């Protein structure tokens, strides 16, 4: 088995090394990841400048681009042969609910799926992560399962793991995305020259975090596994929208 590993925390982040080492027992692992932390990069591609790649002493490839750049590069000509599966992570922090819209970790998995491969995004939930090995072992088990049981097309798995020793994990739950309240206001500061600068505010607190959500699974000590569908079309709205549009008269 050939496995492509990427992330958004950067090629030197502890999570990606632990993940790659664990997955190496299953086959050939190639690591292609950003040269620095690119958290929040979402699905962005670099289109206005070339990408530069450096191979590190440990064999990992460092890319001066986004997580999506890394996976796109790896699967469209940089790596030969291409991988059988993409695993993104282990992210240092949660990717729950609305987080997936901004997450470079999830985006790297999405890019793998866009390019035809099964893909998993895996994140650790906690403030000071101590148990990356737990997530690495869970990722390995999921890769084994997916090698024999293919996911439907247009689908990835978003996996969140409590920062606990493996023997304290209470099980796995298939979940839906919860939601957060709106983000906190921006933070305004001033640089040494007195000019205003702005920081994006913290994420909002949980809004929909009841039973069945990814938030709830984590709170109860379970691994949250949320299947995400890349086709974002809202099919149930078709009839209503068609009726609405029929009422609009377009005249030349």
UniProtKB/Swiss-Prot annotation:
A divalent metal cation binds at residues 8-9, 39, 91. The keyword Cytoplasm applies. It is an enzyme of class 3 (hydrolase). GO terms for cellular component: cytoplasm. GO terms for molecular function: 3'-nucleotidase activity; 5'-nucleotidase activity; exopolyphosphatase activity; metal ion binding; nucleotide binding. It is found in: Cytoplasm. Binds 1 divalent metal cation per subunit. Its EC number is 3.1.3.5. Pfam families: SurE (PF01975). Keywords: Cytoplasm, Hydrolase, Metal-binding, Nucleotide-binding. It catalyses: a ribonucleoside 5'-phosphate + H2O = a ribonucleoside + phosphate. Its cofactor is a divalent metal cation. Nucleotidase that shows phosphatase activity on nucleoside 5'-monophosphates. Belongs to the SurE nucleotidase family. This is 5'-nucleotidase SurE.
């Amino acid at each position: 088995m050939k496995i492509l590993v990427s992330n958004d925390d950067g090629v030197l982040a502890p999570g990606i090394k632990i993940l790659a080492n664990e997955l190496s027992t299953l086959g050939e692992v190639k690591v292609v990841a950003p040269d620095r932390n690119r958290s929040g990069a979402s699905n962005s591609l670099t289109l206005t400048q070339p990408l530069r790649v450096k191979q590190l002493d440990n064999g990992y490839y460092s890319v001066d681009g986004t997580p999506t750049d890394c996976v796109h590069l790896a699967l469209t000509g940089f790596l030969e042969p291409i991988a059988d599966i993409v695993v993104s992570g282990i992210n240092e922090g949660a990717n729950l609910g609305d987080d997936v819209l901004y997450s470079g970790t999830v985006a790297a998995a999405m890019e793998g799926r866009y390019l035809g491969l099964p893909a998993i995004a895996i994140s650790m939930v906690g403030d000071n992560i101590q148990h990356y090995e737990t997530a690495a072992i869970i990722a390995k088990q999921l890769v084994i399962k997916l090698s024999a049981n293919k996911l439907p097309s247009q689908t990835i798995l978003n996996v969140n793991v409590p920062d606990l020793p493996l023997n304290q994990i209470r099980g796995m739950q298939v979940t839906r995305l919860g939601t957060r309240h709106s983000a906190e206001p921006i933070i305004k500061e001033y640089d040494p020259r007195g000019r205003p600068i702005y920081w994006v505010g913290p994420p909002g607190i949980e809004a929909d975090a009841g039973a069945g959500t990814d938030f709830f699974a984590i709170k109860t000590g379970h691994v949250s596994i949320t299947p995400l569908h890349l086709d974002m079309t809202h099919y149930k709205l078709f009839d209503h929208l068609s009726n609405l549009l029929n009422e609009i008269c377009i005249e030349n």
